[in-house]
Every structure is written in structure tokens, then in C-alpha cells.
Amino acid sequence: MSENAGTPKKQGRNNGAVVMMCLSFVFGMGAMSYAAVPLYRIFCQVTGYNGTTQRVDQVSSVVLDRTMRVTFDANVAPGLQWDFKPVEREVNPKIGETIQVNFTAENRSNETQRGQAVFNVTPGEAGVYFNKVQCFCFTETDLKPGEKLDMPVVFYIDPEIVKAVESKNIHTVTLSYTFYPKEGPKPVASNEGGAEKIEKKL
């Protein structure tokens, strides 16, 4: 009798352990999925994988007697009514030379909009050698209705690009940007209205 009575309790404990293991697995997979995007972004920034350019604080001390053709591409994702384009479609700096180019963005909507630029370089092998000293893509951009903004990019091509087997024969690279909408802070009036509603409810 005692052995039979103890069996359901043991099975219950086993079932509980299985449930806990399943829940832990589900939560663990969810956490990994949430962290995958920022971790992948960090990996690309460090390695230059997938055409991600490098961010640096200093310029190159070496300038080669060889030029690199750099073309520019500008795009705007749905949700932003912006006119976004490069001032120059291409430049031909010397490899290692620090150069500034400019883009312009104009808000065509009747409301303030916030955007964040995402960038990459093609061919992807050149990404690790494309170094940005200054870029509007490092921060979010707010544009009021009808506002037009000049946005500089300061960069250079690392001279090491001519030494690597996978990149030494590259003569043209394309720097591409896409602006995506970002949610801005709520207006103060909206917050105050919410506070009044809470006070009345209390």
C-alpha cells in the first residue's frame, strides 16, 4: 500500500520537473532571440562583417598614391516623409586620405519626425577598412516640418585594404544609408493631460 501511494507523488514531482525544464528552455530561447540583434550588430561593427563600417576616433597617418572610387546611396524606409540624398554621388579620395562628404535630409511632412540612419558598405569585404571619424548615423536625427539639414560624413579608407587578399583588387566601394523612423518623446501637453486624468480618477 505504501509503495502504491508514493508512486503518484513521485510522478507528480517528475512532471513538475519536466514542466520547469520546458519553461526554462522557452524563456532561455526568448532571451537569446532578444539579445541576438544587438549582439549581431556589435559583432558586425567589430569585424566589418556584412559590410558594416568601422567607427574610429583618429585619422590615418599613411596616405597611399592610389585612389578609391566611393559612391553613395541614400534610401528612406516607409514611415518617414523625408527627401534624403547625397550632395555628391561619388568621390575619388586617395587611400588613407581623410575626406568629408555631405548628405541632405528634408522633412516633407507637417509634423516633426525622428529618424535613425543604418549603413553598410559594398562589397562586404571592404567594410572593415571603411573607417568613419564623424557621421550623422551615430545619433538619431529630428526634423521639424519643412526643415532641411546638412549632414556631414568624415571617413577614410584604411591603407591595409591593399594588402588583404580578399580586398586588394577592390577599386570601387558603395556607402549606403537607409533612414528608419524612430519614436520620439511624447509632447509635454500630452503627458500633462495624462496626469490630469489620473488625478481626476483618484
From Swiss-Prot:
GO terms for biological process: respiratory chain complex IV assembly. One of its GO terms (cellular component) is plasma membrane. Residues 38-202 are periplasmic. It is found in: Cell inner membrane. Keywords: Cell inner membrane, Cell membrane, Copper, Membrane, Signal-anchor, Transmembrane, Transmembrane helix. The chain crosses the membrane at residues 15-37. The keyword Transmembrane helix applies. It is a single-pass type II membrane protein. Residues 1-14 are cytoplasmic. Its main location: membrane. SUPFAM superfamilies: Ctag/Cox11. Disulfide bonds: none annotated. Pfam families: CtaG_Cox11. GO terms for molecular function: copper ion binding. It comes from the Bacteria. Exerts its effect at some terminal stage of cytochrome c oxidase synthesis, probably by being involved in the insertion of the copper B into subunit I. Belongs to the COX11/CtaG family. HAMAP family: CtaG (MF_00155). PANTHER family: CYTOCHROME C OXIDASE ASSEMBLY PROTEIN COX11, MITOCHONDRIAL-RELATED, CYTOCHROME C OXIDASE ASSEMBLY PROTEIN COX11-RELATED. This is Cytochrome c oxidase assembly protein CtaG. The gene is ctaG.
